[in-house]
Amino acid sequence: MSQVPSVTAVQVENVLFPPSVKPPGSTNDLFLGGAGVRGLEIQGKFVKFTAIGVYLENSAVPTLAVKWKGKTVEELADSVDFFRDVVTGPFEKFTKVTTILPLTGRQYSDKVSENCVAFWKSVGIYTDAEAKAIEKFNEVLKDETFPPGNSILFTHSPLGALTMSFSKDGSLPEVGNAVIENKLLTEAVLESIIGKHGVSPEAKKSLAARLSELFCKEAGDEKIEAEKVAPVAC
């Protein structure tokens, strides 16, 4: 297993996202890729609803660096393809959504479902399998309530399983409440947060800035290794 990249924690409002976590249903430690708020402009005031942290498996850095190292933070932040590569990459992801204002499971699932279905229909990939996955997603959340400080947790397996769990006190359970086997849903939940129409532009900017820095470090480490094995000139 590759070493967890050295990253810092991120404070979003009163929510602290630690530098690394072991998600429910996973055997891996994932590092904090980025974090930010989700909010809406309501009557001229920006109202913050949730704080969102996105964690990535260690292999995300070398995998993404192949295509994206050397790009500026602005180039990454403005690139739809970059965030698609994060969403669809062959590495584990974990999303922690912590409430700032009270939220019901039905409120949350209705909005996420709407965003997922809209995305699938826009790219022509909405089938009966996705409809059933959304139904199960809504079922898992329908009776839940999330006072401020509670969290909805998603472990996104690259094999196509979405593990859903909840936390009332900031701790992470070892196992999930439910697992939905649908690759498109597994990706679409994260797409709804950091994709083209993602609900947290702040989390996207944070991801771009932190990954850009890690790509630079990755390139520097590769250069050092290359110099170690290069023959010494006579």
UniProtKB/Swiss-Prot annotation:
GO terms for biological process: flavonoid biosynthetic process. Substrate binds at T50, N115, S192. Keywords: Flavonoid biosynthesis, Isomerase. Pfam families: Chalcone. Pathway: Secondary metabolite biosynthesis; flavonoid biosynthesis. GO terms for molecular function: chalcone isomerase activity. Its EC number is 5.5.1.6. It catalyses: a chalcone = a flavanone. It is an enzyme of class 5 (isomerase). Disulfide bonds: none annotated. The keyword Zinc does not apply. SUPFAM superfamilies: Chalcone isomerase. The keyword ATP-binding does not apply. The record marks Y108 as: Important for catalytic activity. It comes from the Eukaryota. Catalyzes the intramolecular cyclization of bicyclic chalcones into tricyclic (S)-flavanones. Responsible for the isomerization of 4,2',4',6'-tetrahydroxychalcone (also termed chalcone) into naringenin. Part of the biosynthetic pathway for all classes of flavonoids, a large class of secondary plant metabolites, many of which are brightly colored. Belongs to the chalcone isomerase family. This is Chalcone--flavanone isomerase 1. It comes from Vitis vinifera (Grape). The gene is CHI1.
